[in-house]
Amino acid sequence: MSCKKTIQLVLLIWFYTIPLAAEPGILNVGFDIDDTVLFSRDVFLNIPANKRNPIDYGWVNKQDEKMSLFIEPTVELINYFINNGHNIYFITARSGENGKFLAKLLTKNFNIKITKNKNLFFCPKKMINGKRFTTKHRTMEKLNLDLFYGDADSDMVAALKAGVRPIRIVRHDKSVSQYGKNYFGNTLDGKSKENPFATEDLKIFYSKSVGIFGESIYPIIWNGPEK
């Protein structure tokens, strides 16, 4: 199935399963950044030791042009929405220091003006009792989003909390294995109280095109980085 037909099928399913947006025919669509729009593994692997704890996102936001790759199937999806007149927003858990560099990169790639706090939002996680929790749902509510595409559990939870339809972009294997824990706990460690799902369990979910929160799985085929 071609990318265009796949996108059309996903949209058709969406239209028949939840109410239409407030403005008929026009959708407000949100996208996460890391591992959804950008394969940013190399940025996070190369953070200098003195900028790791906590992560210096002012440094991170300046490195994408040199180290990150656009995930082409997601780019095609975003361009489809743009070309058909829908509203696109980017929402990331990064902090906003030097966010203009990320905005510039997105503007260049999508050929539309991307501006911090207008269609690019930085929503750092909030620390509560020693654990970090997403704050993206607040921005999703303000934007009255219809759909949100993301790779992480926190993206799905934020969308559901905001009353937005969540759609999972499956994180690339190289991203999971080389620098970051998987969602659903750490599936690489197998099942435990903290990690209720193992890698094989995820494959069962994905084969049915559904995630553990009931979210849709957006099917993409991307070869990833050369190494």
Model-derived segments and spans:
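Alpha-helical substrate-recognition element adjacent to the catalytic core
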Residues: 25-127
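Short, Lys/Arg-rich N-terminal segment immediately upstream of the first membrane anchor
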Residues: 1-3, 26
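Boundary at the C-terminal end of the N-terminal hydrophobic targeting segment
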Residues: 19-24
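C-terminal cap/substrate-recognition subdomain and adjoining C-terminal extension
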Residues: 95-227
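Sec-dependent signal peptide recognition
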Residues: 4-12
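Compositionally biased regions
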Residues: 3-4, 18
